[in-house]
Curated annotation (Swiss-Prot):
Belongs to the bacterial ribosomal protein bL33 family. This is Large ribosomal subunit protein bL33A. One of its GO terms (biological process) is translation. HAMAP family: Ribosomal_bL33. Keywords: Ribonucleoprotein, Ribosomal protein.
Length: 53
């Protein structure tokens, strides 16, 4: 059975957390990095996985 955990994606430029997504921890243990639109920067930038608090 797959272990999916919710992860938050934060903008690489302004550090704002904009997206919430799910990832399979067993298949992809490394951090996610996706190109997404940041509403604060008003452009498409890399959003990386933010550490859970």
């Amino acid at each position: 059975m797959a272990v999916k955990r919710s992860t938050r994606l934060g903008c690489n430029d302004c550090r704002e957390i904009n997206y919430l997504t799910f990832k399979n921890v067993k298949k992809n243990p490394e951090k996610l990095a996706l190109n997404k639109f940041c509403s604060r920067c008003r452009k498409v930038v890399v959003h990386k996985e933010v550490k859970r608090k």
